[in-house]
Each structure stands twice: as structure tokens, then as C-alpha cells.
Amino acid sequence: MSQINISIDCVLFGYDSDLDLKVLLIKRKYDPNTAAYKDHNSLPGDLIKYDEELSPAASRILESLTGISDIYLKQFSIFSDPNRVKHPKDQKWLRKFRALPEERVITVGYIALVNIEDFNTDATYFKDEIIGELTREGYYEKIWAKVNDIPELAFDHNNIVEEALKYLKKELNHELSSILLPKNFTLPQLQKLYEDILGKKIDKRNFRKQILKEGSIVKTKHTTNTGKKGKPATFYQFNDTIKETVKD
């Protein structure tokens, strides 16, 4: 009987100053003789160790492949299709570094949230001395892809991203929004984040009326010149109650 492996794949959502919700992907080295995907984009993921529990393994894997740690990280689903790594493209790539590439792999999906501006987005985390033995798998760069423009990914990772976005949509609240947004943000930034997650346009007037009525955000003294005629844009912050909820 073949062995069943357990892996963890992390869907790291980030929001940036371009007002785009994005997903962090790992771009692996391309060997034209053996690689199946030109650029081979995938989610940050790896097999768990024999003596690891899931949550510590998720933190280890995310940090080892992205350099990012101590962030919101939560299990959201399990992907157990017996054929999820059996596609010829995937098998061709797996043979590069696994003795038994045909073995079944059940993956546990974790969702992670960051504000992109808070983290270094260059590829320095992927130098050989940082990755160590993981360089055998060819990791060498990380990229942020817009959620509405995800390229073809390895294995069933496109489906995992879709399920993670559904989970985020279902769980969307101001606590999660406060993680993705900068400390000081404008109402257009907040509205665009909600639109990206919900996948639809929101009426500007109704959105602002509802948000301000809830009292979850407070106006700051900061303003910015948008370069357009009219009043400068006002910055807001989530109130202390929201911030404490996130910490808990």
C-alpha cells in the first residue's frame, strides 16, 4: 500500500497601495528538459514533518518560503482528491525531487493575511543561505498576483485559491479588514478592499453611510492631496475595540 502524505498550502492574501487584493505565489526555476510549467507558479507549501502538528507546521512552512511570520494564519479547508497530484504535468515536476511522486497527498489549506506594505517584497528571502535544503525544489522568487488575474498554478492550487477567497468572503468583517489595510486608510481604500473580496461593485454612498454608522472606524487628523479638485481625502483608523479583537 502506498503512503499517504500530508502537506500544507498557504494562501497569503495581501493588500497594497495600488488598491489591489493580491495572493503571494512562489515562482520556481524552469528547466526546459524536465519542468512542466513555464515559470511554475504555486502557493507556498510543503509536506509536514512526521512529528509536527498542523499549526506549527503551517507557521514553519510559511516562514521558510516567504520570510514572513507572526501574522494571521488560520486553517480553512482540506483538499483530499486522490488524483490531486496525478496530472501528467505535476508528475513530471514531482519526479525531479521525490522518490515516489505518485504517492497520494492530502493538503490542509491555511489562509494568511498581511498588508503588503509592511513586508519586504524583494526576493532576498529566497537566497540559498536562507532557504537551505529547500533549494533542491527550485524555489527562487515570490510574486504578488491580483486575485482576479491568477495564472495557471501547479496541482490544484487554483482551486485552493478560489476556496480561500470564498472563505474570506464568508468571514469578512472589520477585524480582518484591519489586518489587510494600513493603519491610516481612506474610505475608497476600504471600499475597494470589500469589492475585491466580495467580487462585486458596492454603492459608494450606501457603503460610507453604513460604515460610519457602525462606529467601527474613527476619523483622524491626517489628510492627503489626491491631485484632483475638491477636498483632500480624509484618513481613518479602526477603533481600539476592533484592534483588540484581532489580537485576541
Language-model segments: residues:
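N-terminal strand-loop-strand
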Residues: 1-41
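Active-site segment of metal-dependent pyrophosphate-handling enzymes
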Residues: 4-6, 22, 56-59, 63-125, ...
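Short, cationic low-complexity segments
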Residues: 33, 128-144
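Short histidine-centered catalytic/ligand-binding loop motif
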Residues: 42-51, 179-180
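Long, intrinsically disordered, low-complexity Ser/Thr/Pro-rich regulatory/activation regions
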Residues: 106, 219-248
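Short acidic, hydrophobic short linear motifs in intrinsically disordered regions
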Residues: 181-193
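Short helix-coil junctions and helix-kink-helix linkers
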Residues: 193-201
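Charge-enriched amphipathic alpha-helical scaffolds
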Residues: 201-219
